[in-house]
Design a protein with these regions (language model features):
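Charged, amphipathic alpha-helical coiled-coil/dimerization segments
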Residues: 104-159, 163
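N-terminal helix-turn-helix DNA-binding core of bacterial DNA-binding proteins
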Residues: 35, 45, 49, 53-95
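N-terminal leader segment of winged-helix/HTH proteins
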Residues: 1-62
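Canonical helix-turn-helix DNA-binding module
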Residues: 66, 80-125
Length: 176
């Protein structure tokens, strides 16, 4: 039977109860002072799973993961199409080994090139190729059409989510 479930996270119609709301209820009976924090983190983690799945479905026809798309898009945004791989890691907020792996996969597909910096041989540069630019543009159009997985959310709500998560990032030390 479908029922309207009222939770602290809004009303929804469901055949089954919201597992996070149920976890919140259970947590509240044992650790009430932590229940809201647990539910917030669990909700963010679940939303991340759902959105990554939607985004990767959009990117699949292009043979890209979201990490690979982000790397291509970052390179495409630069004036020269080239960045030091260390700087890419900083801008993408990932470990340098992750950048190396992603760039390696993109390089094997001919979407980026990799080589030493002419100014400092210790620095490895990644450069987007014309084929990489084409795929980055096509994938960006597809993601824009999909609303990045949240097309059904009003823009104002998306902005509210961004603002709320910014405070989480500040609290976690990700931003000043």
């Amino acid at each position: 039977m479908r029922e309207r479930v009222k939770t602290a996270y809004g009303d929804r119609v469901s055949d089954t109860p919201d597992p996070i709301a149920e976890a919140h209820r259970q947590w509240s009976s044992r650790w009430p002072e932590h229940a809201d924090h647990m539910a917030a983190v669990t909700s963010v983690m679940r939303a991340q799973q759902l959105l990554l799945s939607r985004i990767e479905a959009v990117l699949k026809p292009y043979g890209l993961t979201f990490a690979a798309y982000e790397a291509l898009r970052l390179l495409a945004f630069t004036r020269t199409g080239t960045l030091p791989m260390g700087k890419m890691g900083t801008r993408l907020m990932v470990h340098p080994a992750s950048v190396t792996n992603v760039i390696g996969r993109l390089e094997r597909r001919g979407l980026v090139g990799r080589g030493p910096s002419p100014d400092d041989r210790r620095v490895v540069l990644a450069t987007i190729t014309p084929a990489g630019r084409d795929i980055a543009e096509d994938a960006t159009l597809a993601l824009n059409r999909s609303g990045f997985g949240i097309a059904d959310l009003p823009a104002a709500e998306a902005a509210e989510i961004t603002a709320a998560l910014r405070s989480v990032r500040v609290s976690a030390g990700d931003l000043p």
